[in-house]
Amino acid sequence: MSDITRRNFVNGTLMAAGASVLPMVGTGQAVMAALTPSYYPPTRTGLRGSHPGSNEHAHARAWGGQSNSGAPTALNEEYDLVVVGGGISGLAAAYFYQQEYGTDKKVLILDNHDDFGGHAKRNEHNIDGDIRIGFGGSESLEGKRDYDEVMLNLLKDIGVDLELFSEAYDVDFYKRHNLGASTYFNKRIFGEDKVVKHPFCGYPAFIEGLLRSKLPMEKAVEQTPLSKKGKEQLMRVLKGGEHVIDIPKEDLKEYIHTHSYFDYLTNTLGVDDPLVLRMARHTSIDYTEGGTDTLSIAEVLESGPLGIDPSISWKNAIGDGSDQKYLRKEGDTFSLKDPYIHHFPDGNATIARLLVKKMIPNVGSGTNAQEIILSKFNYDELDKPSNNVRIRLNSTVVNVVHDGPPHNASGVYINYINNNKTYQIKAKGVVMACYNMIIPHIVPDLPQDQYVALRSLNKVPLQLSTIGVRNWRGMKELGIGMVMCPGNMHQAVNLDFPVSIGDYEYTKSPDDPCILHMRSAPLGETIGAPAIEQFKEVRYRMLGLTFDDYEQEIREHLSGMLPKELFNFDRDVQSIMVNRWAHGYSYGDPGDIGRQPFGRITIANSDANDTSLVQSAIGQAYRAVKEQM
């Protein structure tokens, strides 16, 4: 067992044994670290996200064709509503149901994971007695200017003040520490380990306050380990734009929507260097649904591709769209009207926790976002029989069927598997807030057109690894706030967002512990293969890797990138959480047919609206609850 695996075991599994002797340094994080946890998933290290044990029963049905989960044990439990899926949409559905029909209504939420929140995954790293909080999925509250009344009322009711981020987010942090965006070329792919202080793309621009590169593009290209031919071709891409396309100006807008980005690279610009194409393919990461080899020019331009600002190089093609009206072109602030600062330390897990706290008051302390950020939830409270809302984790729903003809049924039977045993409960209604693509496999009598619509959906695989490190001196030395990594599994690495809320304080000095976020939207091996084929390939590959595989990749990545005199993996890395989401972003729209009610069963989840934003998850939950009438 490697050192990091031993540390993971000690920190993740045996924390309770050592909690009483952790050093106290007077911070809110230290007080929290000293609390003895029992069942507390946020501190679990190793493979997280869709962790081992969370998807096996669902995959047996969807991939293996298994339809018989054994005779269920009938429990003497009947609810007004059962919610399948404990992500933000499922939690919001339970919340809205009580708001609509009374807080005395009995609701049970079933989820296949060992924690609630779905993609809104809280990661807590205990680094020498100091709790560092990170996010393992759903990242921020985006598009605030477009929130509807339902969303705003929910946020207000659970204790979220959107104005607090203007002070909580330390936009001057990067300037104070001289941190910007760079690119890391690794030895395994590019022939040598080298960091160039230029991102060559617009992806890092979403991080408010991150310094823009002052290194001229020509000098940056010259510093890369590319061949002479590769450097010439990279420069051609960076200086490209609408001016190289020989068509009338008025036809440009249609052109970029109907022509492939990779066709533009290879045929229009004549790029054939595999390393330049690799850089181009890996720039969008989680901005888009798949790699840039599967997208149109217009889709890629939205993701900050290789090259200068698209609002300059593709000005006539993209026009003066809504985004261009609020982007700031100068300085280090990306957006004026809706800056990307609405981020809790644990991402949108704070929203999930506030919803749980609202419905199960005894789960922990705090009544708003500031107070709850360091609250150590008592998971023993989640499924108490005395609760009007109960959350049952590690429970995979495998069958949902009406007790009679759907149009006049009086209830719904729900079968689920917990600890390899099948149980049955009953409810007056069910909200399916799970991945919509699994619904046809567990609701057996769906109408054919609805079955087909839901089966057509897919998911974009994503991965977000959080690394607890004792210091970030190496990042400081290289001036890295975010670094693009086109040769690695994780395509970008960044310091956690500089947010301090309540008694939680963000790292102040490079000598302090912090979390490194390593991002990945893995791609298939074949350039240009259809996106869905690539998703499937990546999904199997992702789930086939062990923690040792991920640890070795992370070890090689960080050790090759950071200065050896300032970073030693075994000494400085305290903990690793690999949040694998083999089923990540929504892909495909089920339409009205797919999301329509079916008897006493209604459908929520952001999948129902073909978007992965939290406001969509909440909006679809609201609709699904209204349809329960």
Label the model's feature ranges.
Residues 2-81, 99-104:
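Extreme N-terminal leader/targeting segments of oxidoreductases
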Residues 225-395, 405-409:
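Active-site/ligand-binding neighborhood in enzyme catalytic cores
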Residues 134-145, 247-254, 337-346, 451-456, ...:
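Active-site rim elements
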Residues 39, 67-255:
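N-terminal glycine-rich phosphate/pyrophosphate-binding loop and immediately adjacent elements
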Residues 385, 389, 393-517, 526:
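Mid-domain catalytic core of redox enzymes
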Residues 93-95, 118-125, 441-445, 478-479, ...:
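Short, solvent-exposed loop/turn and secondary-structure capping segments
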Residues 34-70, 124, 188-189, 193-194, ...:
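Conserved flavin/dinucleotide-binding core of flavoenzymes
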Residues 80-92, 111-113, 397, 429-436, ...:
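Conserved beta-strand->loop/alpha-helix structural units within folded catalytic cores of enzymes
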